[in-house]
Regions:
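Alpha-helix termini
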Residues: 112-119, 264-269, 333-339, 414-419
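Membrane-embedded alpha-helical bundles of multi-pass enzymes
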Residues: 1-220, 254, 428, 435-437, ...
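A generic fold-level signal
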Residues: 24, 144, 226, 320-322, ...
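Active-site catalytic loop in hydrolytic enzyme cores
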Residues: 72-87, 114, 141-166, 321-405, ...
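Non-cytosolic juxtamembrane linkers/loops
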Residues: 205-268, 432-443, 448-460, 465-504
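Conserved hydrophobic/aromatic beta-strand scaffold that supports enzyme active sites
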Residues: 14-17, 105, 233, 327-329, ...
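Soluble catalytic regions of membrane-associated enzymes that act on cell-envelope
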Residues: 214-358, 379, 384-391, 396-402, ...
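CN hydrolase (nitrilase-like) catalytic-core segments centered on the catalytic cysteine
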Residues: 92, 96, 281, 288-309, ...
Length: 535
């Protein structure tokens, strides 16, 4: 019965990462209450293996439901047989759940000798749970290149706990979310054992956490940078089969350029920047005729705007070919010859997608089984320049790069050439591989968290969704319906100033979590030394 409850709780937990199908205001409650189930099981057992298995089962259920959309890319677009695609998603979910199992085992091992019937020590287990879970999330975010999707902190993009994002980042929000679930589990535990005094203390701690969060939410972490700009975001909704069909290339480009050149609803607010999705041009820039690129430069001149355009780029560096997934900036003054040679403002993607943009060692057989146009790209260099337009500094990121929040931080600081740091973040993506599924809404929540961490607006131009504009406090100002072809004209106010998280990254919350486990280990040793010896 316990294991079935954990599976159901995990499935409900998966619903907390995007407002689909649940409304946005419920997500934080669903996350905390569902995660309280494995916390209760972990706190109630002295067996490390049982605690690890409880956290593992809960997490595996959550991931199987929460990242089901990977099946669509492998089966519908990759041609992988349905059983094999389902098995691949299942095995991946099991791998991701190992970090939760580690958190459960660590909590049980360090907490089982605590005297939890005393108020000062009663909060020990929830704190250990929060520290261990946070470290598990952090490890999941970089081991084997990392996959921090559905970090529990993202469930709180609209909750009071998000006020901690400018201080500790999403891992700090995850720490507090895990702590809230642990305190909730303790409240049930002490009610069950008729210890109302300790239960009241746990409830007070939980309430205090949200009161402090409310106070923090009043802090403004940024100043406005210059006047706002009008930005046009293009959502082409080009079918994947059409996008990578050479015979359909010009048709798909005409569709998206046609959207880009629509008259502005307010002639006084014509767009200064037009952002296209990732790989709007699904071939390398030097494989297109100069006449094509001249037409793009003419489009920029016609619109009196700078175009941010996603395209693969081919360059030659010291006699070696380099292939990158990139974003380029084009305006009326761009030289076609320089463009063909990649001598223009360009950002090359740094965090590549395993299986999509590079093949992990030992997995060539898996890639060969997929019928997807995969690339073998080179990684972009560190310290790439932002795009400067009308006094604003735009920092690009491509696809799921904005899932790795700490990697965006260097763009916020003064650049090597003395240029100011980014005042606007922008993401270009093509999530068409995953259909009109939860992943579109989940990615939007992730981008909202990046805005809160950095106190910067984030604009998102995607092929199928979610195309949106987010302000520096993580609020969605406007968005397009998914799976539609349209444009979104928005006023974007750039910002300046550095949050604490922008200065220190994930290091602070990781250190706090390690210290918490260290204190738990010291307490465990003391408890063992003071145990009476049985005769």
């Amino acid at each position: 019965m316990v294991w079935l409850l954990l599976i159901v709780a995990g499935a409900l937990h998966a619903l907390s990462f995007a407002p689909d199908p649940l409304p946005d205001w419920t997500l934080a409650y669903v996350q905390v209450l569902s995660m309280a189930v494995p916390a209760f099981v972990v706190f109630s057992t002295r067996h490390i293996g049982r605690a690890a298995l409880a956290a593992f089962v809960f997490s595996a259920s959550s991931f199987c439901v929460g990242i089901y959309w990977l099946y669509i890319s492998m089966n519908h677009f990759g041609g992988l047989a349905a059983p094999l695609a389902a098995l691949a998603v299942f095995l991946f979910a099991l791998y991701l759940s190992l970090y939760a199992a580690l958190a459960g085992a660590c909590t049980a091992w360090l907490g089982r000798d605590m005297n939890v019937m005393r108020v000062p020590l009663a909060v020990g287990r929830p704190l250990l749970w929060a520290c261990a879970w946070t470290l598990g999330e952090w490890l999941r975010g970089f081991v084997f290149t990392g996959f921090p999707w559905n970090n529990i902190g993202y469930a709180h993009a609209s909750s009071l706990l998000s006020a901690w994002a400018p201080i500790f980042g999403v891992y700090g929000v995850a720490f507090l979310a895990a702590l809230a679930s642990g305190l909730t589990a303790c409240i049930v535990y002490y009610v069950k054992h008729n210890r109302t005094g300790i239960m009241a203390a746990m409830a007070s701690a939980l309430m205090g956490m949200f009161i402090v969060s409310l106070a923090l939410s009043r802090i403004v972490w940024y100043d406005n940078q210059g006047p706002p700009l009008t930005v046009r975001l293009v959502q082409g909704n080009i079918a994947q089969q059409m996008k990578f069909d050479p015979s359909q290339l010009m048709s798909s480009l005409q569709t998206q350029f046609g959207l880009a050149t629509r008259p502005a609803a307010d002639a006084q607010r014509a767009p200064s920047v037009i952002v296209f999705p990732e790989t709007i041009l699904p071939t390398f820039q030097d494989r297109m005729a100069p006449e094509f690129w001249q037409s793009v430069v003419d489009l920029a001149d016609q619109m009196k705007a700078t175009l941010f355009l996603g395209t693969p780029m081919h360059t030659v560096d010291d006699g070696k070919d380099r292939y990158t997934n990139s974003v380029i900036a084009i305006n009326a003054n761009t030289s076609v010859q320089a463009l063909m040679q990649a001598q223009l403002p360009v950002y090359d993607k740094r965090h590549l997608v395993p299986f999509g943009e590079f093949v992990p060692f030992g997995f060539r057989w898996f890639v060969d089984a997929l019928n997807i146009p995969l690339g073998d790209f080179d990684r972009g260099q560190q310290g790439q320049k932002n795009f400067a337009v009308n006094g604003q500094q735009f920092a690009p990121n491509i696809c799921y790069e904005d899932v790795f929040g700490e990697e965006l931080l260097p763009s916020l600081h003064t650049q090597a050439d003395g240029a100011p740091g980014a005042s606007v973040l922008f993401n270009v993506s093509n999530l068409g591989w995953f259909g009109n599924t939860w992943t579109l809404r989940q990615h939007l929540q992730i981008s909202r968290m990046r805005s809160m961490e950095t106190a910067r607006p984030m604009i998102r131009a995607t092929n199928t969704g979610s195309t949106a504009a987010i302000d520096a406090e993580g609020r969605v100002l406007a968005q397009l319906p998914t799976a539609t072809a349209n444009i979104l004209d928005v006023q974007v106010q750039g910002t300046q100033g550095l949050t604490l998280y922008a200065r220190v990254g994930n290091g602070l919350i990781v250190l706090i979590s390690l210290l918490g486990l260290g204190v738990g280990w010291i307490q465990k040793r003391r408890s063992r030394r003071t145990k009476p010896v049985r005769s």
